[in-house]
Amino acid sequence: MKHLHRFFSSDASGGIILIIAAVLAMIMANSGATSGWYHDFLETPVQLRVGTLEINKNMLLWINDALMAVFFLLVGLEVKRELMQGSLASLRQAAFPVIAAIGGMIVPALLYLAFNYADPITREGWAIPAATDIAFALGVLALLGSRVPLALKIFLMALAIIDDLGAIIIIALFYTNDLSMASLGVAAVAIAVLAVLNLCGVRRTGVYILVGVVLWTAVLKSGVHATLAGVIVGFFIPLKEKHGRSPAKRLEHVLHPWVAYLILPLFAFANAGVSLQGVTLEGLTSILPLGIIAGLLIGKPLGISLFCWLALRLKLAHLPEGTTYQQIMAVGILCGIGFTMSIFIASLAFGSVDPELINWAKLGILVGSISSAVIGYSWLRVRLRPSV
């Protein structure tokens, strides 16, 4: 029990469990004895009905759309705290992850197009390497434990959130044909209600969560990625302390173990099971997976590092306190973990064209993401000193 308590008390424990869940998913998805059970579990239908409202989704989508909204709620709370009181409190500090995210989307997309521009079909996947899987990136960072400066973790969170928002906008503009304006209208009203609650000083967290459920449902029905609702709710929950209590900090404290030890490992287990059946070296070196690998492994860190360097040289932004440019470069490599967000964009880009292209895209995403995780982790492990 003593060793178990020590493990769960360590900062790296959540990341270790997430990696174990991902490896387990890969093994089960590629084993003849367990692949059927694994896919049956993910395809299990789950129905929610409240009055006339009905949501029918399989287990995989409930995990990705509902449980991950809770994760994004926690991320929103943490980023808000740093924007208001911490390492992103000044305009120049807050601008740094925004500039980094822009570079981290533009350069990978251009690098992908350098490989695929001549092919009008694979060219449609230009946004695949522009995405970052924030959950896996933070999970890998968590493996380094307490040696990671808080400012560096917050920088990665803020960068990945902006990256995700960019990906959501790209999906809405280029890959979605059936946005529901009525649902977007309901979402806008829910956001307005959250703003009024905040301005009126309402401090009951449950009220924000209730409106957040309405917002999540509306965003889900609109065709936009529903996890966005979690970030929005997190930004509106009051942070200011009153009588020594802060609703945002209290909720953050409550959510953290649930997210680290249940939601993220379940997310990893549900999404890491990529089948390697039929994979060949010849296929891996075709323009589609090569463009994705190059975009994630080279384009992401290059774009983030280049735009950060320009921001510092032009004095548009400051480095987060307690971090170095080399650490920022390593975080840029971690942002090459595109994984689930990249797979989602690939399914939108090629789903109606050729399922075989999705398989090759998944292979490129897997190779690029794993390579980025290993290299980014190794670089940070060398650059970060263990805390005493």
From Swiss-Prot:
A GO cellular component term found in this entry reads: plasma membrane
Q: Which reaction does it catalyse?
A: Na(+)(in) + 2 H(+)(out) = Na(+)(out) + 2 H(+)(in)
| Record-linked InterPro entries | Na/H_antiporter_dom_sf (IPR023171), NhaA (IPR004670)
Q: Which UniProt keywords apply?
A: Antiport, Cell inner membrane, Cell membrane, Ion transport, Membrane, Sodium, Sodium transport, Transmembrane, Transmembrane helix, Transport
Highest rank taxon of the organism: Bacteria
Q: Name one GO molecular function term.
A: sodium:proton antiporter activity
One GO biological process term: regulation of pH
Residue ranges annotated as transmembrane are 12-31, 59-80, 97-116, 123-130, 155-176, 181-200, 205-222, 224-236, 254-272, 287-310, 340-350, 358-380
Q: Where in the cell is it found?
A: Cell inner membrane
How this chain sits in the membrane, per its record, is: Multi-pass membrane protein
What ranges does the Periplasmic topological domain annotation cover?
Answer: 32-58, 117-122, 177-180, 223, 273-286, 351-357
| Residues in the Cytoplasmic compartment per record | 1-11, 81-96, 131-154, 201-204, 237-253, 311-339, 381-388
Per its database record, what is this protein's job?
Na(+)/H(+) antiporter that extrudes sodium in exchange for external protons.
* Family in the record: Belongs to the NhaA Na(+)/H(+) (TC 2.A.33) antiporter family.
NCBIfam families found in the cross-reference section: NhaA (TIGR00773), PRK09560.1 (NF007111), PRK09561.1 (NF007112)
What name goes with this protein?
Answer: Na(+)/H(+) antiporter NhaA
> Its gene?
nhaA
